[in-house]
Regions:
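Glycine-rich phosphate-binding/hydrolytic loop that grips phosphoryl groups
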Residues: 123-125, 310-347
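Glycine-rich phosphate-binding loop plus the immediately following alpha-helix
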Residues: 158-201, 225-226, 230-233
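Short beta-strand scaffold segments in enzyme catalytic cores
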Residues: 21-26, 144, 152-156
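A contiguous, well-structured pocket-lining segment that forms one wall/lid of small-molecule binding clefts
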Residues: 77, 197-282, 291-300, 329-332, ...
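N-terminal beta-alpha supersecondary unit
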Residues: 9-80, 86-90, 119, 123
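Conserved phosphate-binding/catalytic loops in two-lobed NTP-binding clefts
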Residues: 116-117, 298-321
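Glycine-rich beta-strand-to-loop/alpha-helix junction loops that act as flexible
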Residues: 86-89, 106, 148, 283-291
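Conserved phosphate-binding catalytic cores of ATP/NTP-utilizing and phosphoryl-transfer enzymes
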Residues: 117-142, 324
């Protein structure tokens, strides 16, 4: 069955859990009126990864103009807003504080309800955006694979707001593993899109192992990363030297092998869990869900309807926070002014 929510609402959603300053206006949990993202990718690329202090300071610089852009693009003003939603965790403490304190201040001054949202639940509700309704189309239960730079969680969604954590990574998150693999291959940061691009045209001359962790729904990517590292060391281009980088063919084939291994493990374990729990659909969320190989493999083997957000909605955005908040309000969700941040918040 679908989600019955009779109240018309426009929600202003904030997402600042990591390195994206994102603000969106969302109507009725499904229709995006504006979705503005101020990315810090280029800023952090020079350091080879996200620097928390730099991220939080950049949020302070970007948050006000991002809010202004969201209202301008939507053609709305404050009188049109019915509630304010914000990511309260998990994430980087300094980054979360910027979003939460701005959202609190605006909600208090405008006499609007404040709704704190779990970032991971936001990634799930990205699947309700763009006019879709997986609940109405397929029904519950569903399997959700949330895969990003900070998380790789396999979750059974029994209904709205009711989740069971089936498995998670035991070491690196998938996105973190992509970043480390890209560093080994000399590709830079962020690793996911760079590995995907470098893999184009590969013919499959390289093979890396798969870590299945049989008997569990957990994931492990450190072994795949180590296998790639050992290949790089054996061929003499890691640790990197000024005049001893890998040739383009080696980079292409190794990048493809790494991407294939990580994607296959996530896809197969997700499908196995879907069959075990007799779910009615599979949903993806998180930045790694934008990976074309993962989308392709899951699309080929999923035994049930598969929902994957558009790539722009897989990465961190305010629209998914607004969507999650809308459906929470159906259960009376509303936070007090002393709402805190929760850097280690879990979904279940």
């Amino acid at each position: 069955m679908g989600i019955y929510h009779p109240i018309h609402m426009i929600i202003l959603g904030f997402e600042t859990s990591c390195d994206e300053t994102a603000v969106s206006l969302v109507e009725d949990g499904r229709n995006i009126l504006s979705n503005v993202i101020a990315s810090q990718v280029e800023l952090h690329a020079r350091y080879g990864g996200i620097v928390p202090e730099v991220a939080s300071r950049q949020h302070l610089l970007e948050i006000v103009p991002t809010i202004q852009s969201a209202f301008s693009l939507a053609g709305l003003d404050w009188d049109d807003v019915d509630a304010i939603a914000v990511t309260k965790g998990p994430g980087l403490a300094g980054s979360l504080l910027v979003g939460v304190n701005v959202a609190k201040s605006l909600a208090f001054s405008r006499h609007l309800p404040l709704i704190g949202v779990n970032h991971l639940e936001g990634h799930i509700f990205a699947n309700w955006l763009e006019g879709r309704d997986p609940g109405a189309e397929s029904g519950f239960p569903m399997i959700c694979l949330i895969t990003s730079g900070g998380h790789t969680d396999l979750v059974l969604m029994e209904s709205i707001g009711k989740y069971v954590l089936l498995g998670r990574t035991r070491d690196d998150a998938a996105g973190e593993a992509f970043d480390k693999a890209a560093r080994i291959l000399g590709l830079g940061f962020p690793g996911g899109p760079l590995i995907q691009k470098a893999s184009e045209g590969a013919v499959g001359t390289e093979i890396l192992p798969r870590a299945w962790l049989k008997g569990t729904d957990d994931f492990s990517f450190s072994g795949i990363k180590t296998a790639l590292l050992n290949k790089a060391k054996d061929r003499g281009f890691y640790p990197p030297k000024d005049d001893n980088g890998p040739d383009s063919t080696t980079v292409r084939e190794m990048a493809s092998a790494f991407q294939d291994s990580v994607s296959e493990v996530m896809a197969v374990k997700t499908v196995n869990a879907a069959r075990k729990h007799k779910v009615r659909a599979i949903m993806l969320g998180g930045g790694v869900a934008a990976n074309s190989k993962l989308r392709e493999v899951l699309g080929n083997i999923s035994p049930v309807p598969l929902y994957i957000p558009s790539p722009i909605l897989c990465t961190d955005n305010g629209a998914m926070i607004g969507a999650a908040a809308y459906f929470q309000t159906g259960n009376g969700a509303r936070d007090s002014w002393d709402m805190d941040i929760y850097p280690n918040l879990r979904l279940s």
